[in-house]
Each structure stands twice: as structure tokens, then as C-alpha cells.
Amino acid sequence: MAMEARIRGWAAAGLLLAAFPPFAKAQESKRVDPVVVTATRIETPAAEVGVAVSVVTEEDFRTYHYATVDEALRSVPGLEIRRSGSLGKTTSITIRGATANQVQVLVDGVRVKSPTTGQAELSDISPDLIERIEILRGPQSALYGADAIGGVVNIITRRGTGPFSATVQQEVGNYDTLRSRVSGGGQWKILDYAFAASHLESNGQFKNDGSEARALSGRLGVALPWDSHLAFVARWNRTDTDLPVKFVCCGPLAVEPLIDVNQQQQSETLVLSLEGKTRPVPWWESRGRISRFENSMGFQDPVDPGYAFDFPAFSQINVERREAEWINAFHLGKWSTSTVGLEYRHEEGENKGVFRSRTHTQSLFFEEQLRFFGRLFLTGGFRVEDHSVFGTETTERGSLAYLIKGWGTRLRGGAGSGFRAPTLNDLFYPGFSNPALKPETSFSWEVGADQKLWQERIRLGLTYFHNDFDNLIRFVMLPVPPFVAVMNLARARTSGIEAMAEADLLKNLVGSVNYTYTDSETSGRNRPLAREPHHRWNVGLTWEPLARLSLFTQVHTASRQFEDETVGYNRGHTRVDVGGTYRALDRYGWLQAVELTARIQNLLDEGYAEVRGFPALGTQALVGVRARF
């Protein structure tokens, strides 16, 4: 019966793909390669970098009506998104088998990972004011230091341009979902400005399964002489989340969760950044930034009625990170760029009534880019990072890209080392911490090729990657108090393939597919890494049958994943999303356009859990209206 249901599901998905095609908007056949900044810390055409890089644009958010950042990242090859249940629940990201602790997440270059847990909470990042998201896969510690073993996700906010413009959007859906958003921006003389406010709430599928997220964002810039610019960015959000899954001691969570009726969490985040950049002469550009990240998280779980042996739990965790960086790039003609950077980082965390600790880090990095004949591009560099607790780490990375322009071919490859710093919890939390911990380390390499065919209407890519992880930090049981501790005692390996294809099938029809195969193994246990599927597929089509109408379909498939020795595997799943935009009104007075929007996630009502014990939502529809001024 399960097989028949899956066959019926795939058949229905096939019909939907034929009827409602998905993925990026149809464009002219001639495309311009994007310019990225995350791969080299300065603006560089993507074709000139040897690392695997993907870009999610502001246009993607408008086309697919992503309500959250994690939904926008699901279609990127090599990435795995794991949400623990419904909207607002904890959401993490892994890249090529590297855990969430080993992936660096930035907003305008500012680290937004918690110093205590070591993870970035994607549900706390609003999709407001996003111009693009650049995703680097592979080790990036030579540029970004600790916690960039698996890659970097850099969310870049939009700068105001041109006359004032604004967008107002309202959406409603099942599960009592309501989403409201307003944004605007523009430019006046030497000033540029952009702002946004949003609200997202939903009641979820269980009792005590609701969430409410509110966010404010703003960016103010000023143009200065000598090709200079100064910008101040502020982002605030608060997420109130009900947690319906009851913790069960000493065993894995059941597939069907036990409901906790009064467990709740609140998270409030503030990110502030002041950045200045200048290029007074063609051969030198300089950029400086100071920033501050704050997060306050409260957790409450009173005694549940009806349980004889239940116990209450409460916590209040406050963290702060202050950063300063200064980067200088020196250009020698068109063939050489040397980049030198200095960074300082101060981190502190407090679990009220438990512990309070702080660390500081100083870093120096150097990178050299060489360009030969407009075809061969070499990049190499290193970083020295000194941590106040565990000492100094040095990481290196090198890459190359070679263009065969007459064939539309790009060959690329690279290798590098990385490390993940122990968190404040690892080092200082009473009862299990270990101040003698060393960083997790890695060495990774990759080779790949990209091909354009049919006057660039077809775009293909293939990458092979290999990662070796050492000194992994793990919990171990002890025969004496405190009975549990963290130690450097594990090793792991991942390798695999990322393949992608995108085609402009017609002028109004674009299709894409990408596939990731990941083979992983934990040394000594002869088992794959937990929650890392062997196979992932993303399929999409976007169709514009009328000038006013755009339709899309996206299909996400993941194979089963190893959970642990007790329960074995968490089964795989296939999720189908569809939607579209209809422009109901064109220019009328101040109105630029009025659009009707729709997005339906999990159309086939697939029952699955990205994290075992935390069931994902069934079919979720969100429809609304968007007005642009």
C-alpha cells in the first residue's frame, strides 16, 4: 500500500509539473554571470572563483513567496534544511554533511550564530530587505575563520536606490496562518534608505503548536567623496514559539509525539552594523565594519497536568558578540589582487543562575587572486586566528577556475583546511564542559565543471567533493560524577556528487533540477552521519502562460536518514509545492501594480518529519495580495 501511494504521489507530481511548471523566472537566453562578494571578500564575477557558489535573489523571494529564509535555501544543491515541526520551530542547516555547528551564517558579514549553542537559528532571521543570499559550499575558514568548515551562508540586505518605492503585502492561510509585510526605500541626494516590517503567525497542527514572529529592519547610507560610502544597518526580531513535543528521558522520541501543553520559548535578536568603504584610487580599496549581535532566549516548561513524575524546567540565556574588521585590497593592473584583513571578535554568554563566560579572538588573513589571459583564475590564502582559550589555529585554501570560452566550459577545483571552535557551552557549562577541548578540524577538496549549451539556454554543473573531519566534539558517559563530559574523540568522512541542470525550455518556460549524493561514515562505528540522507533531489519549473500570470512548481525529495542505533532510520519523503502570481492591476496613479499571490506547500499532504519526533505540517496554503507603489 505504501508503494502504491508513493507511485500515485509521483504520478500526481508529474501531472503538476506538466500543468504548472516551476523554478526561476523565464528570462532571455543570454544571461550575465552574477558578481559575488562572499567568495573572496571583494566583488568578483562568479565565473572567476573556483569554489561552488549559489545565489538566491530578491526576485526568487518575490516569485516563490517564501515566508521564511529556510524555504528559500531548500533548493540549493548540497544543503539540507531541518525544521523541527511547524512554522517558527528551531531550524538548522547542514552542507555536504557538515553539521549546523560547522556552517557559518552571516547577515551583511555579521555572524549570527549563538556563542553558546554554536548554531544559527534560521527561524529567527526574517526574509525582509534581502537583496540576495550567497551560499559557498566547502571549507571557508581561510576567509571566515572558525565554524566555516562546511561553508558560508551570507545574507546581504538591499540598499535603497532611485525614487521612493514601497510594497505592502497581506497573506492568509490554513493553520490560522497570517503574514503581513511592508517595505520601502529610495534615494535622496547623497542619502539612500530602506526599511521593512513584518509579522508572521500560525497556530500549527497540535495543541500548543503556535508561533508568532515580528521583525523590523532598516538600512541608511550616505555617499561620500572619493568613491566612498557609509551604511548603518539594524535588524530586530522577536519569535514567540509554543513547543508541543514533550521531552522523554532516556530514549528516542516517538514518531507520534507526546504533547506538552505548556512548554514555550521566546527569542529576541538585535543585529547592528556600521560599515564604511572607499576606493580613492584605482589600485586600492578599503572596507571597515563594526557590529554587534545580541540574542535573548527564554524557555519555560512548568509541570504538566496529569503526569505524576514530571518536573519543571526554566532557563534564560543571553548572548552577545561584538566584532570589528578592516579589509584592504590592492590591485595590480587587471591580473593581481592582494587582500589583507584584520578582525577582532568578543563573545560572551550567560545562562542565568548557571554560568557566565566570555572569550575573544584576533585574526589576520591574506588572499591573493591572479588572473591570466582572461581564462585562468588562481586564488590562494591563509588565516591565523588566535583564541583566548584554546590558542592559535592556521587554515589555508587554494582554488582555480579555467574558462574554455569557445566551448562555454568552466573547469574548477580547490582544497582547504577548516576548524570549528568549541562553544561557550562546550568550554564552560558546569557539569559537562571541558576547558581543555581543542577545535574540530577538517581537510576538504573538490573538483567540478560547468557547461553552457544552446546559446546559454542550457546550464549544467557537476561537482565531486570529499571532506575529512577530525577531533569531533562528542558527549561521552563517565562511570563517576559528573557522569557525562564533552571530548575530542570522533572522526568522520563525507564524499559525494552535486549535479545541476537548468534550461530555458521556451521563452516563457524555465526548468531546473539538481541532485546531491552524500556518502558519510563515522569512524569506529561504521555508520553514516545522523540525519544525513544519501540522496536529495530538487526539481522546479516556472511558466508564464500569460503576460500577467506566472506559475511555479517545486519538488523536494530526500531519502531515508540514519537516526541512531536504537530507532534506526527516519524514512524519506517527497514534498510538492505549487503557486503563482497574477498581476491584477498595472499602473494606476501611485500604484505600480496589484498582484494576487498563492503558495501551497506539501500539496500531496505527505506525512514526514525532517527531525524524527517532530512531524512536519501537512498541506499548507497561503494566498494574498501584494501592492507595489
Residue ranges, per PLM feature:
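Transmembrane beta-barrel wall of Gram-negative outer-membrane proteins
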Residues: 174-201, 206-241, 250, 263-288, ...
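Short acidic/polar hinge/loop motifs at secondary-structure boundaries
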Residues: 110-137, 431, 482
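Extracytoplasmic beta-strand/coil segments of soluble accessory domains associated
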Residues: 70, 74-114, 131
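N-terminal periplasmic accessory domains that precede
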Residues: 69-72, 90-94, 103-106, 120-126, ...
